[in-house]
Amino acid sequence: MTLVEEILDAKAGEVVIRNVDLVYAHDGTMPLIIEAFNKVFNSVKARAYVFFDHVYPAPTVKVANLQKEIREFARRHGIPVVEGKGISHQLVVEMGLAEKSRIVVGGDSHTPTLGALGVFAVGMGATDVAVVLGLGKTWLRVPESVAVIFEGKPSRTTMAADVMIRLITSLRNYDMNYKALEFFNVPFTADERLTLTNFSVEANAKTALIGEEYDGRNYIKEISFELSSLGPMVAKPFSPANGVEVEKVEGTKIDQVFIGSCTNGRFEHIKRAAEILKGEEVAVRTIIGPASVNVYKRMVREGIVDILLDAGATILPPGCGPCLGRHMGVLGDKEVVLSTTNRNFRGRMGSPTAEIYLASPLTAAVSALYGEITSPGGEV
């Protein structure tokens, strides 16, 4: 059986109804969830959490009023609200909520991040999340699974983001709709494992999980992925599937670098960027977005905040930052950013004429020093 089949206790293609162990949403999706919930339900029957991470603190009166509405709804229904502590997917991990769960539904497309912990986690739209809140359960068609088996070890300049840009690019002509990605023989750290499952959504995967031993049964596709020969990658505008070796875009001038997000804002990511920036000065706007308060505190304890500030970087409060183009570093017309986020669609981080290149924290940090896309090969 695949990992998905084991958790859902059903074969791929079957339609099942399952209890949901945890449902969560954030300030960006919760208003529509509340609207749908109030049309049908009077009480919450699910274990639920709300996180303020997308546009926090509120930058406008409109956003402030929406957040006020969320607080009032949560108070009425006894739902904990976590404000200003970081990105929802990171906090669910840090708070131990994922460890106590088998099936998780989130009001965000990157909920499958939790699959790094062996959880069947899926993002759903507002109506489906509202139903989970009201019933404590959901229906699912058990997805088929694609197995990714890693071979070899990554080089010192290769990070999980490089792996995923290459994998997503290789799958762009393969129909991943409503299929799961399952990773085996994974040589990455806990922080980097979360990058693998988080980025899987950009391959159009329904969810993603990390397993231990690959048994080869019931998988519709098997991908052997050699790590030792993989170098730094960059995804060109305007798709994460536009991946190329960094050398092919080296020298591209950039206006801004963003290192953070639910993809690459964990401690290891920022520490490795700081190792590059130590004693140097950035050549372009460089924004650092810790994924959580705990990440930020550790940055303070280990002197990383001083390194980044001395290098000329701007450190944001924990949260999503400019990833979704709402505040704290949005792009102007025709500006170019090198970002460690997971999406580079037109207009994603601000102006629709801006260009977004995606890369690992290492590539982003080195590029910040030179003001152009640069391979980290000689700097690490």
From Swiss-Prot:
Annotated [4Fe-4S] cluster binding sites: 262, 320, 323
Asked if the record carries the keyword Cell wall biogenesis/degradation, the reply is no
Q: Which InterPro entries match?
A: Acnase/IPM_dHydase_lsu_aba_1/3 (IPR015931), Acoase/IPM_deHydtase_lsu_aba (IPR001030), Aconitase_4Fe-4S_BS (IPR018136), Aconitase_4Fe-4S_dom (IPR036008), HAcnase/IPMdehydase_lsu_prok (IPR011826), IPM_dehydratase_rel_enz (IPR050067)
Task: List the keywords (alphabetical).
Answer: 4Fe-4S, Amino-acid biosynthesis, Branched-chain amino acid biosynthesis, Iron, Iron-sulfur, Leucine biosynthesis, Lyase, Metal-binding
Cofactor annotation comment: Binds 1 [4Fe-4S] cluster per subunit.
NCBIfam families xref list:
IPMI_arch, PRK00402.1
Look up the EC number in the record and give it.
Answer: 4.2.1.33
Q: In the UniProt record, does the keyword 4Fe-4S occur?
A: yes
Q: What class of enzyme is it?
A: lyase
What are the recorded Gene Ontology BP terms?
A: L-leucine biosynthetic process
User: Which coenzyme or cofactor does it need?
Assistant: [4Fe-4S] cluster
Q: Briefly state the protein's biological role.
A: Catalyzes the isomerization between 2-isopropylmalate and 3-isopropylmalate, via the formation of 2-isopropylmaleate.
- Recorded superkingdom: Archaea
User: What protein family is recorded?
Assistant: Belongs to the aconitase/IPM isomerase family. LeuC type 2 subfamily.
Q: Which SUPFAM superfamilies match?
A: Aconitase iron-sulfur domain
Q: What is this protein called?
A: 3-isopropylmalate dehydratase large subunit
Q: Name one GO molecular function term.
A: metal ion binding
Q: In which pathway does it act?
A: Amino-acid biosynthesis; L-leucine biosynthesis; L-leucine from 3-methyl-2-oxobutanoate: step 2/4
Q: How does it assemble?
A: Heterodimer of LeuC and LeuD.
Q: What's the source species' lineage? A: Archaea, Methanobacteriati, Methanobacteriota, Thermococci, Thermococcales
Q: Cross-referenced HAMAP family, in alphabetical order? A: LeuC_type2 (MF_01027)
Q: Which reaction does it catalyse?
A: (2R,3S)-3-isopropylmalate = (2S)-2-isopropylmalate
